[in-house]
């Protein structure tokens, strides 16, 4: 995986760097924008007017834009381009957070992913695994005995796959194994799920706030081209190392 993908990552202000992206050349934008709630130097709100000016120019017709967020920032994100907003996905984490407030409120165990597009995008259903089931009251009239139980009591109509829902259950990267390298890092498996859902192999994904480079890793793993920008020098170096290791 990833041997023939095109990777283009740069350190700097994404609003300046996106000016160099050709019009309507991006198949998907997948980004965890700064929420401006931590007070950290890297957590500074990007002006939405200017951000959407770039997004609208560079995204292809029918390209999906998936933006991570959580309340109260979620409401701001949705309202930033309501005409293009389509629906919300929920990432359900394997463990809750904010144990310091566990006696005051429920643990935080999810984040929002807001999906925007200007026309129907590629949608490759990422089927869920489940228990195969039998549709009963059908007799075996198939001469080749395909898809039927041997006792003629029913027909296998499903191999266990289920249509995905708006809730995605994926574990966080393990901080104790050194795979969690950024305070707001998203699991590579979750990013792969999104990328495979809304793009095909060989297409191009942009993450204009790539942090430690997880979206780039997910693109390499799924044979997508990647453009990534990061303002912070430390996290850019981490992203560069991770992505280079994946390309070896």
Which residues make up each language-model segment?
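Core catalytic lobe of class I
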Residues: 1-228, 234-237, 248
């Amino acid at each position: 995986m990833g041997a023939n993908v095109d990777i283009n990552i740069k350190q700097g202000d994404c609003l300046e760097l996106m000016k160099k992206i050709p019009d309507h050349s991006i198949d998907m934008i997948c980004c965890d924008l700064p929420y401006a709630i931590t007070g950290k130097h890297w957590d500074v709100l990007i002006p939405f007017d200017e951000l959407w000016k770039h997004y609208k120019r560079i995204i292809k017709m029918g390209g999906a834009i998936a933006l991570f967020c959580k309340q109260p920032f979620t409401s701001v994100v949705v309202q930033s381009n309501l005409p293009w907003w389509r629906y919300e996905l929920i990432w359900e984490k394997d463990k809750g957070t904010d144990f310091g407030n566990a006696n005051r409120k429920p643990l935080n165990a999810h984040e929002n992913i807001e999906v925007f597009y200007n026309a129907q995008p590629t949608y490759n259903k990422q089927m869920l695994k489940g228990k195969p089931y039998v549709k009963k009251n059908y007799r075996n009239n198939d001469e080749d005995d395909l898809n039927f139980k041997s006792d003629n009591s029913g027909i296998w109509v499903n191999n266990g796959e289920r249509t995905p829902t708006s809730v995605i259950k994926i574990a966080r990267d393990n901080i104790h194994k050194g795979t969690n390298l950024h305070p707001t890092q998203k699991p590579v498996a979750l990013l792969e799920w999104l990328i495979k859902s809304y793009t095909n192999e060989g297409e191009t994904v942009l993450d204009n706030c790539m942090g430690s480079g997880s979206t780039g890793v997910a693109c390499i793993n799924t044979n997508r081209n990647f453009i990534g920008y990061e303002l912070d020098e430390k996290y850019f170096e981490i992203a560069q190392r991770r992505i280079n290791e994946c390309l070896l």
